[in-house]
Curated annotation (Swiss-Prot):
Cofactor: Zn(2+)
UniProt organism field: Shewanella loihica (strain ATCC BAA-1088 / PV-4)
Biological role: Involved in base excision repair of DNA damaged by oxidation or by mutagenic agents. Acts as a DNA glycosylase that recognizes and removes damaged bases. Has a preference for oxidized purines, such as 7,8-dihydro-8-oxoguanine (8-oxoG). Has AP (apurinic/apyrimidinic) lyase activity and introduces nicks in the DNA strand. Cleaves the DNA backbone by beta-delta elimination to generate a single-strand break at the site of the removed base with both 3'- and 5'-phosphates.
UniProt cofactor note: Binds 1 zinc ion per subunit.
Protein name stated in the entry: Formamidopyrimidine-DNA glycosylase
FPG-type zinc-finger residues: 236-270
Any one biological process term the GO annotation gives: base-excision repair
Similarity-based family: Belongs to the FPG family.
Amino acid sequence: MPELPEVEVTRQGISPHLLDQQVTGLTVRNASLRWPVPEVAQQIVGQTIRGIRRRAKYLLLDTDAGTTIVHLGMSGSLRILPKSTPVEKHDHIDLELASGKVLRFNDPRRFGAWLWCELPEAAHPLLAKLGPEPLQSGFNVDYLAKALEGKKKAVKLCLMDNHIVVGVGNIYANEALFAAGIHPQTEAGRIDRERLTVLVAEVKQILAQAIKQGGTTLKDFTNADGKPGYFAQKLHVYGRGGETCTQCGNLLSEIKLGQRATVFCGLCQPR
């Protein structure tokens, strides 16, 4: 599943092609995504795209009439292509531009979304209760200490809770906890301020590095140019259960936590 870095890489890739472009058409070949593509999504036609933003794992295409909300789901991708490019399997939506290009949404598993919002997007049900962005100043040790106070839930599950902090999915939660030396099953409310300071710094550093590397491609993800991300080459624990720790040589353990694969080093991340 594309996480925050992959969505941000996509935003950066499509932005130069969309900004200040007039939308000349919206072709929906298959409206059966995670939620049906609404008829009101056509209201973007004739509008000029004023901004391309990311909130959590959602992409927001702003116009004067409203905002298109796009989610890549489990396997979705967005590419900028000439309008004449032949349609391939799973190419569900084309946003047609005055430049002669299209923003093409491909989603084999159809867990993605293409929605329309006329309200201030912060009031949309999908966005209203989201936590802070991890790369912004609002995500800091003071905030995290307060958010985790008294929580008995495993810290990894808290990192992946979008009400606490957005966009830190399974890949980067595993990596940040390893870098901070924190066992993923540690009760969140029992982590002292010193270790939380390290954790916040590692979350920010790892996400920023992943964006710089073009995201992590494990199976489906490609950027707006159809190229994979290369951060997978820098993964220390995710997907490496049973292999040796890059720091100490101990065998990495793998468990299920919240139904997600969780990999850690029992020596570098003592419980």
